[in-house]
Structure formats: C-alpha cells, structure tokens
From Swiss-Prot:
Lineage: Eukaryota, Metazoa, Chordata, Craniata, Vertebrata
Keywords on record: Cell membrane, Disulfide bond, G-protein coupled receptor, Glycoprotein, Membrane, Olfaction, Receptor, Sensory transduction, Transducer, Transmembrane, Transmembrane helix
Species in which this protein is naturally found: Mus musculus (Mouse)
Coiled-coil annotated spans: none
A UniProt-annotated Pfam family: 7tm_4
GO biological process, one term: G protein-coupled receptor signaling pathway
Name the UniProt record assigns to this protein: Olfactory receptor 5P81
Keyword Cell membrane on entry: yes
Function: Potential odorant receptor.
Family: Belongs to the G-protein coupled receptor 1 family.
Disulfide bonding pattern of the chain: 100-192
Topological relation to the membrane, as annotated: Multi-pass membrane protein
GO molecular function: G protein-coupled receptor activity; olfactory receptor activity
C-alpha cells in the first residue's frame, strides 16, 4: 500500500522510483553495464585495500587514508547501485519510506566522508612535501586516527541534518520520484509541507563542507606546487608529482560533479542531466578511483609488481 489515511492527510508509505529510462531495451543494456561497473568497483577497491594491508612499503599515512577512501567508494556505490540494478529488471520500481530515508542518509553520510578524506589526504601530501622533517610528528598514528574519526563524525552530523529533514517532510502524494534513488531535491519537490528552514540548513551544511574541504585542498596544493618548483632535483620533482597527480585527478573528478549537482542553479540543467551526473558521481567515480591510483602512483605500481612477482606488468 502506497498511501495511508492519517486524519485529514494522506501519508505516503512508499515511493516509486522512475529510474533512468522507460525503454525496455535500454534498461537491459544499462543493467549489464552498471552491474559490470559495480563488480569492478567492489573488486578494484577491495584489491586496493588488500594491497595496502599486505605491502609494508605502503604502511604510511597517505595509504592508510587511501584504504579508507576505497572502503567509502564501495559504500557509496553500494548505497545506490544494487537497488538500481534490480529496478532495471522490474516493471514497478518501489522503495519503502524507511528504505528511502536510509538510502538518502547513507548516500549523504558516505559522500561527506569522502570529501573530508580527500582534504585530509591533501594535507598529508602538504606536510610530506613542504615539511618533511616534521612529517612523522604531524602525521603520527594518533593524529591519523583523530583525522579519520573527525571525518566520520563530520559525515554523521551532515547526514543527520538530511535525515532529520526527511522525517520532517510531509508527503501527501504523488509518490513518484523522478530519479534512480532517493535524492534530496526530488524529495523536496514531492513534499507538501513548508520546508524552507530545513532546506536552508541542509544547503548551509553542504556548502560549508564543500568550501572548507576545497579551501584545504587548494591551499595544500598551492604550497605543494610552490615547493616542487623550487626543487633542484628532477628526480625529486618527479616523485612529488607522482604521489600528487593521482590524488589531484580524483579530487578534480569528484568536485567537478559535486559542483554540477549541488552548486550550479537548478534552472541551468534538466532533471535528466542531473541523473546522468549522479550516475557518474555515485557509480562511475568509485570505479575509477582505484584505477587512477594504480596507473598514476608509482608506489602503488611498485607494491603491486612486488606482490605479483612481475617486473613488466605496466
């Protein structure tokens, strides 16, 4: 049952996800493609985590955070992709009220953690390249754990705002979400209550996270670039660039899509464009991250060669 009578209001108990397309042939094609992407995402990120665990040369703060970033990538993709894949095969794609709230909260939670982790990793590279003599002190095991816990706490607080907003919304019908998952904007459009204060609070929280993390990343990489340009050793420059380019590529991909979804005015793009960008953000980027790090980071490539016992893999 999609609706229940509650006094003078009709309360929504489930939502219909309209998904990416109604074309049956295209749905099958997308099912195959996205399922393959999800399998590559899980296997690639699990491989990254395992490689970091078993390779002693990767037991450094940067790779400690990278292993957690890989875990978050699996979590972000898993919060949406399995349900989306199943919905390609059914005629009526429905999700319960509770399930919708959990999906929204988990997507926001893991997305915020990823932003914090990328900022922490940028700070780690800043200390390693600009203050190498203080690296062991500034990035001690205790400091790394504190930064990690802080990232999770920040993600939890951010997700709490969105979850509180969701349970405060009054849904009277219709219950058709024009998206492939329970995203915040389509839910706001379906709500029949006054949500202006909650929307401002959620927007402020999102904006704060984006501004703070982008500021940390920008300042860190500006200082890194200045330091690298001052290096006289070509080998030193190459090593510094090697450890930074992979992370900077991931940052560019993530914040490019986040800017499109959350910063650009909604009137500047259509709902279908938003869906495509959301697929890239929640499905494709988690798959690309381990590939980027394995191809562009010499330490990752070296550890992989050592574990596989091969010398000419790359």
């Amino acid at each position: 049952m999609a609706f229940l009578e509650d006094g003078n209001h009709t309360v929504v108990t489930e939502f219909i996800l309209l998904g990416l397309t109604d074309d049956p042939v295209l749905r099958v094609i997308l099912f195959i493609i996205i399922l393959c992407i999800y399998l590559v995402t899980v296997s690639g990120n699990l491989s990254t985590i395992l490689l970091i665990r078993v390779s002693s040369q990767l037991h450094h703060p940067m790779y400690f955070f990278l292993s957690h970033l890989a875990s978050i990538d699996i979590a972000i993709s898993s919060s949406v992709t399995p349900n989306m894949v199943v919905n390609f095969l059914v005629e009526r794609s429905s999700i319960s009220y509770i399930g919708c709230g959990i999906q929204l909260g988990s997507a926001v939670f893991f997305g915020a953690i990823e932003c914090f982790l990328l900022a922490v990793m940028a700070y780690d590279r800043f200390v390693a390249i600009c203050n190498p003599l203080l690296y062991s002190t500034k990035m001690s095991k205790q400091v790394c754990i504190q930064l990690l816990v802080g990232s999770y706490i920040g993600g939890f607080i951010h997700a709490s705002f969105f979850t509180l907003s969701f349970v405060s919304f009054l849904f009277c019908g219709p219950n058709r979400i024009n998206h492939f998952f329970c995203d915040f904007t389509p839910l706001v459009e379906l709500s029949c209550s006054d949500n202006s204060v909650l929307i401002i609070l959620d927007s402020f929280s999102t904006g704060t996270i984006i501004v703070i993390t982008v500021f940390v990343i920008a300042i860190s990489y500006t200082c890194i670039l200045i330091t690298i340009l001052k290096m006289h050793s070509t080998e030193g420059r190459h090593k510094a660039f090697s450890t930074c380019t992979s992370h900077l590529t991931v940052v560019t991909l993530l914040y490019g899509t986040v800017t499109f979804i959350y910063v650009m005015p909604k009137s500047s793009y259509s709902t279908d464009q938003n869906k495509v960008i959301s697929v890239f953000y929640m499905v494709v980027i988690p798959m690309l991250n381990p590939i980027i790090y394995s191809l562009r980071n010499n330490e990752i490539k070296g550890a992989l060669k050592k574990q596989l016992g091969e010398k000419n893999i790359f």
